[in-house]
A protein has these predicted regions:
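Active-site hotspot residues in diverse enzymes, especially metal/ion-binding acidic/histidine motifs
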Residues: 1-305
Length: 305
């Protein structure tokens, strides 16, 4: 079965799933909420080289397991992949880090191609992709850095986002091949400009177009304000202007570079869902973004907090 056929089947299944599960199609998609609504039990635990697994409902309640050793965006993609197995009627499936030793996607069986295509379309429907671009102040992605920033609003892995942009007809195959050579770690370090970041943390670049939007973040993430003339007002509980102190951070600066003071803030575990961060410009205009911290995902999903 070709990838084109897999995407064709997945697009139909995704459209049905979005409607049946009342999932957003023009914003960040809550895949874990969708799994709960469809009756799939979800658990998280460290799984080594395993991405996750799906257990069909032939012996009882269907369930899936996600690897909490992965960063949040990779867990979200894995969860959407397992939801694809469920919605497309596949049997129990174990998903490893690499489906084959060759080129990505080469030699994958039909059900894995369908589930992978489902995951991309479920998390990145066209309206959601356009909304993410708009919040970046973009009409189209013009560089790997644009894709990295776009993926922060979608909650998706960098490489997966690049591949899906071809399906959305926002880039061509030649551009895809070039952009896939870029490491997301290098891209986030470039955007951070020396600001400290842990290995699984991300940098969220907040442009004027992000005003009044909702941003999903993880503890350790950095919010870099790039609204001209703006500085953060009083930071809510769960945000700090003090850089994280981690032994393996990407930068070992003990303080925030002077140009970024008042424009950089880090997320902590104390952030309450629905917190709003505001900034005021030199002309007294107010910029705000609503923040939602993703929970820890160890154990059964009903205990995540």
């Amino acid at each position: 079965m070709s990838w084109n056929s897999a995407h064709g089947a997945a697009m139909i299944a995704v459209a049905q799933a979005h409607e049946a599960l009342a999932a957003a199609v023009d914003d960040y998609v809550d895949v874990f909420g969708a799994l709960r609504r469809t009756g799939v039990e979800v658990m998280g635990q460290k799984l080594g080289g395993l991405l996750g697994l799906y257990i069909d409902g032939s012996q009882g309640i269907p369930g899936c397991l996600v690897n909490t050793g992965l960063e949040e965006v990779s867990m979200r993609h894995t969860a959407a992949h397992e939801l694809g197995h469920h919605r497309m009627g596949h049997g129990t499936s174990i998903d490893h880090q690499e489906q084959s030793s060759g080129r990505w996607g080469e030699g994958w069986p039909q059900h894995e191609r369908e589930a992978e295509a489902f995951a991309s379309w479920f998390l990145m429907p066209r309206p959601a992709a356009r909304a993410a671009l708009a919040r970046c102040g973009l009409a189209r992605p013009e560089s790997p850095l644009d894709v990295y920033r776009m993926a922060r609003w979608l909650g998706t892995p960098y490489a997966t986002t690049v591949r899906h942009l071809v399906r959305l007809k926002m880039i061509d195959r030649a551009t895809e091949a070039v952009w896939l050579k870029h490491s997301p770690g290098v891209l986030k370090a470039e955007l951070a400009g020396g600001l400290p970041l842990g290995p699984q943390a991300h940098i969220h670049v907040l442009k004027p177009a992000a005003h009044a939007a909702t941003l999903h973040v993880t503890a350790g993430d950095c919010l870099l304000l790039t609204v001209p003339g703006a500085r953060y007002d009083h930071l809510p509980a769960g945000l700090t202007s003090t850089p994280p102190d981690t032994a393996d951070q990407l930068s070992f600066l003990s303080s925030v570079p002077a140009p970024e003071q008042g424009r950089a803030a880090w997320v902590t575990q104390e952030l309450v869902a629905g917190s709003t961060v505001t900034a005021t410009t030199d002309s007294a205009e107010v910029f705000r973004v609503i923040l939602r911290r993703t929970p820890g995902r160890e154990g059964a999903d009903r205990f995540w907090a």
